[in-house]
A protein has these predicted regions:
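Metal-cofactor-binding active-site regions of metalloenzymes
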Residues: 1-202
């Protein structure tokens, strides 16, 4: 949905920004009119019909009514996330989690009566984001705490990530989700990788 909105020139403040919820919804319904024959168009109406029992077509003239009806239903116990998942027979949901995440909510969910499995997925993007040295070093400090070890070189980084990966696996993680924007095709030696890492850690 966000990609579709961006493609239609919707300002980011209406997508991930701080605009009011209805204003964001309204921008979505405006963008949806350009998604005819795109799965997004059909998925949106399937969601409205199957989950909310709303069979109206979402467009600028119906947006407010549909928004208000959905909002009212979402305030009821029958429309809590867990209730919807059970009603829709959802067997597994995977969340996107950083290696430093403690996954405490996954433990709570496992101990609850929810039949749907909620499993973590490994997303280590920040462990590779060396472009901003200050932000990267702040992240390494958090990773050190999560892995309970010092990160003084590249091997330490890999070892810390392995420890966290093992922990994630113990919590049911079987998937990874990577947001790598650029794949660097140049071959690097171990010494070059170490030098780059240490330069980022200065």
């Amino acid at each position: 949905k966000w990609r579709s909105m961006r493609s239609n020139g919707v300002p980011e403040t209406y997508i991930t920004g701080d605009k009011p919820a209805y204003d964001k919804f309204d921008k979505w319904d405006e963008s949806l009119q350009y998604a005819m024959r795109n799965p997004l168009y059909h998925w949106t109406h399937l969601e409205l019909s199957r989950i909310f029992g709303i069979d109206k077509v979402l467009n600028p003239s119906t947006a407010r009514e549909i928004y208000d009806e959905c909002t009212a239903k979402l305030q009821t116990p029958e429309f809590r996330a867990q209730a919807i998942m059970e009603r829709m027979n959802v067997e597994v949901v995977c969340t996107t989690d950083d290696p430093i995440d403690d996954l405490k909510y996954h433990t709570q969910i496992r101990q609850s009566s929810l039949k749907t499995k909620v499993l973590p997925a490994w997303r280590p993007d920040k462990a590779m984001a060396i472009e901003n040295v200050d932000t990267y070093n702040e992240y390494l400090t958090k990773l050190e705490a999560a892995a309970d070890m010092s990160i003084l070189n590249f091997k330490n980084l890999i070892d810390a990530l392995q420890k966290r990966h093992d922990f994630f696996a113990s919590q049911g993680c079987r998937l990874s989700d990577h947001g790598i924007l650029t794949f660097y095709a140049e071959p690097y030696t171990d010494a070059e990788i170490e030098a780059i890492f240490l330069k980022a850690c200065l």
